[in-house]
Structures are given as C-alpha cells and as structure tokens.
C-alpha cells in the first residue's frame, strides 16, 4: 500500500479520521434510524459508540470519541456522527458512484467512492468499504485475509485485511457488537474501538 502525505497536525488528522472512518456505518438520524423508502431484507442498521486513539512515535496521544447510527439498504446509506454531548458533527450520504460528507459547519466533501472521500480528507487510506463488511461479520471481498480465526459458528473473530488488524466479538444476529481495529503507519499507531449499543 502506498504511503500518503500526513495531514498538517495529529489533531486535524484525528478529527478527519473520526468523520471518515465510519463512512461505512449508516444512519438516518442521531437516535434510532428511520425507515428508508423501499426498505427490504437488505436493510442493515446499528447504533453505537466509537473511540479512536492515535499514538505518535514520540508517545503523544490524541483521542476522540462519540456516537454513531447508520442505515444501509444495500444500495444507499445514511450516517450521522455525534460528539459525546450528542451534537451532530457530520452526516454522510452515499449511493453507487457518489459519497457526500456534510460537516456541522456546512462544509461538504464529495467523491465517487467512500474510500476516495476518506483518503482525500485524511491524506491516508482507510478501508471504508471493508468496514461495511466487517460490521456485518463478513470478510472484505477481494482482499485475502491473513491470520484468520473463526469462532465455533464459523464467524470471523480475528484477521488482518488491507493493513488493519481486526478483532470482532460479542456477535448477535446482525454481526459483532465489538470491533477493535489497529493499524501501524509510519510515525503513528491507530486504534479504533466500535461498540454497538442498539441493533
């Protein structure tokens, strides 16, 4: 994987990472997602919390946490991200060929693909497409996993894909309720923890 230039400051990178890492997670509102038009069997939704810690090579840490809710009908998706006080920080809307991130201040970023949107905002690749699979307890298509471990039901519990070490646990009928993702980049280590609080 090619290295990308780092953003100007760890905090800026962390803030952008917070907004973009969860592009794969989908929501219609800050609380429980509302039904999408034409919703059917492919509808997938989750509500939860996230915590992201970036540790620099000199030991300095930047951390951010908040809430998320998402709704995915298999084609289009909606996402809201909130800060710990419950205020909306960003909304993401996506469909085939388009992903748009709108921040609380009205700033908009758009790209044809959510991975490209994340990389534009971060200056570093993020497996947005992979997260959509991992949150459902599936492996990302097109990228062979390393160190794959499964539970007694055959569900993935540990693996490495696209530069991320992932641990999935506390499965319910929709997927893991706890995801711990780690990535080592030049000069920094990224730790992401997602906890599902509502199906």
From Swiss-Prot:
A lipid is attached at residue 29 (N-palmitoyl cysteine). Its main location: membrane. It is a lipid-anchor. Pfam families: LolB (PF03550). GO terms for cellular component: cell outer membrane. Keywords: Cell outer membrane, Chaperone, Lipoprotein, Membrane, Palmitate, Protein transport, Signal, Transport. It is found in: Cell outer membrane. Gene3D superfamilies: Lipoprotein localisation LolA/LolB/LppX. Residues 1-28 form the signal peptide. A lipid is attached at residue 29 (S-diacylglycerol cysteine). GO terms for biological process: lipoprotein localization to outer membrane; protein transport. HAMAP family: LolB. Monomer. Belongs to the LolB family. Plays a critical role in the incorporation of lipoproteins in the outer membrane after they are released by the LolA protein. This is Outer-membrane lipoprotein LolB. The gene is lolB.
């Amino acid at each position: 994987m090619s290295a990308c230039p780092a953003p100007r400051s760890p905090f800026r990178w962390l803030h952008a990472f917070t907004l973009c890492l969860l592009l794969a997670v989908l929501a219609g509102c800050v609380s429980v997602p509302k039904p999408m038009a034409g919703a059917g069997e492919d509808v997938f939704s989750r509500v939860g919390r996230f915590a992201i810690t970036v540790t620099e090579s000199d030991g300095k840490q930047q951390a951010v946490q908040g809430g998320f809710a998402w709704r995915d009908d298999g084609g289009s998706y909606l996402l809201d991200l909130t800060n710990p006080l419950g205020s909306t920080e960003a909304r993401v809307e996506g469909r085939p060929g388009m992903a748009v991130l709108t921040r609380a201040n009205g700033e908009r970023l758009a790209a044809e693909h959510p991975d490209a949107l994340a990389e534009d905002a971060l200056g570093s690749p993020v497996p947005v497409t992979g997260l959509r699979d991992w949150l459902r307890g599936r492996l990302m298509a097109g990228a062979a996993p390393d160190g794959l471990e499964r539970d007694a039901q055959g569900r993935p519990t540990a693996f490495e894909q696209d530069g991320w070490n992932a641990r999935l646990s506390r499965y319910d009928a929709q997927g893991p309720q706890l995801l711990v993702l780690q990535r080592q980049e030049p000069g920094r280590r990224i730790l992401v923890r997602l906890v599902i609080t509502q199906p």
